[in-house]
């Protein structure tokens, strides 16, 4: 993004944790395997959760167990992607992003929040701990962009499914929702989506959204 210039102040970029920074689904599959329930991949588990009520109930019970969120492994490339985004500057050498963590806690899991804090500290460092939001309604958080694996972010201030259609409902959400691909969900074809943190394509996705939302402008040198 060295050919871009910030239009205003630093861009407030929110990152979800489960399924975006940390491999939530692989640990769920491991717990199912301990019960003798084997899935070949996340897609197979997703289908079972969707169509089998008993599997859906067990899926919920797994992450409600205290300690589940402790020592979740980071998704491949997530740590390096965070460091890269944090380091980016524009043509005037201004830092582009101020990065926040926005995560939904499991209130039935008494150790959820402290386990997530420890995971962040272990892999992403103590600096990020000052910028963590645990909240049930992410639409209330004042961001420019939120990267989240959910197909839709819905809450008091509206729905990210409606942001492209101004005639549908009144939206007060401050941020553009970028989806991070998960085989647990199905996504529309017309939404910005990041498929992984490894191959570098996420950079163009984020840049294009920033330009489209007039947060960055491209400069011809």
UniProtKB/Swiss-Prot annotation:
Q: Give the Pfam families listed for this entry.
A: NT5C
Per the record, the GO terms for biological process are:
pyrimidine deoxyribonucleotide catabolic process
- Which pairs of Cys residues are joined through disulfide bonds in the record? none
Q: Name one GO molecular function term.
A: 5'-nucleotidase activity
Q: Which residues form the active site?
A: 18
Full protein name: Putative 5'(3')-deoxyribonucleotidase R824
Q: Which residue spans adopt a coiled-coil conformation according to this UniProt entry?
A: none
At the top level, the lineage of the source is: Viruses
Cofactor(s) in the UniProt record: Mg(2+)
The protein's Enzyme Commission number? 3.1.3.-
Give UniProt keywords alphabetically: Hydrolase, Magnesium, Metal-binding, Nucleotide metabolism, Nucleotide-binding
Q: Which organism is it from?
A: Acanthamoeba polyphaga mimivirus (APMV)
Tell me the residue numbers annotated for binding Mg(2+). Answer: 16, 18, 149
- Annotated TM spans: none
Organism placement in taxonomy = Viruses, Varidnaviria, Bamfordvirae, Nucleocytoviricota, Megaviricetes
């Amino acid at each position: 993004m060295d050919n871009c210039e910030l239009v205003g102040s630093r861009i407030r970029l929110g990152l979800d944790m489960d399924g975006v920074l940390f491999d939530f689904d692989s640990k769920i599959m491991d717990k199912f395997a301990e019960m003798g329930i084997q899935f070949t991949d996340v897609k197979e588990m997703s289908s079972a959760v969707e169509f089998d009520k008993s599997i859906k109930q067990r899926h919920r019970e797994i992450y409600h167990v205290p300690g589940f969120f402790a020592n979740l492994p980071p998704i491949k490339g997530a740590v390096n992607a965070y460091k890269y985004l944090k380091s980016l500057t524009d043509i005037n050498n201004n830092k582009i992003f101020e990065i926040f963590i926005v995560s939904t806690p499991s209130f039935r899991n008494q150790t959820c929040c402290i386990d997530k804090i420890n995971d962040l500290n272990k892999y992403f460092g103590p600096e990020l701990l000052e910028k963590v939001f645990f909240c049930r309604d992410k639409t209330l958080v004042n961001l420019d962009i939120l990267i989240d694996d959910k197909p839709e972010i819905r809450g008091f201030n509206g729905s990210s499914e409606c942001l492209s259609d101004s005639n549908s409902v009144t939206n007060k959400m401050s941020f553009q929702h970028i989806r991070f691909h998960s085989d647990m969900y199905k996504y529309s074809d017309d939404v910005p989506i990041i498929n992984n943190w490894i191959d570098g394509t996420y950079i163009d996705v984020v840049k294009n959204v920033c330009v489209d939302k007039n947060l960055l402008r491209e400069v011809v040198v």
